[in-house]
């Protein structure tokens, strides 16, 4: 998500306006609610299915400036886990991925454009494996969670 499109995304809670709060919550959480509601209704008719939502490491670990973003992504994790518990007996698995900084995304491109200091700091001091994730890494995780190899996994973040 490009910060230039969502300049209100990373602000302290006291600086988040009601309008900014609504934009972030509607984009990151309410949209997931509506998608899952209708996906689950269809999957319940089918008797099986798999949903993988996309949250963020920011939903697991809060940080200064995550006034609206962090709670919105934590909400995605919570609604995913609720749906997993409510639908496990119906043959439906619901999981959520929580990627961290990812090469090739708008946010990382913004950091690179700003001199790459943020990206290098993250890689060298925050990310245990010292390697940025890629969009392929994320896609591979989603494919696995949707596959029969993950038939016993539900409610995981």
State what each model feature region is:
Residues 56:
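Residue(s) in the substrate-gating loop at a strand-loop-helix junction
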Residues 41, 85-86, 151:
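Alpha-helical segment proximal to the catalytic Tyr-Lys
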Residues 36, 48, 131-157:
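C-terminal substrate-recognition "lid" of short-chain dehydrogenase/reductases
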Residues 88, 93, 153-155:
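Short, small/polar-rich loop/turn modules that mediate ligand/substrate recognition or access, typified
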Residues 36, 72, 80:
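Active-site helix of classical SDR
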Residues 9-13, 20-22, 123:
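Substrate-binding pocket helix/loop in short-chain dehydrogenase/reductase
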Residues 89, 101-127:
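A glycine/serine/threonine-rich, flexible loop-to-helix segment
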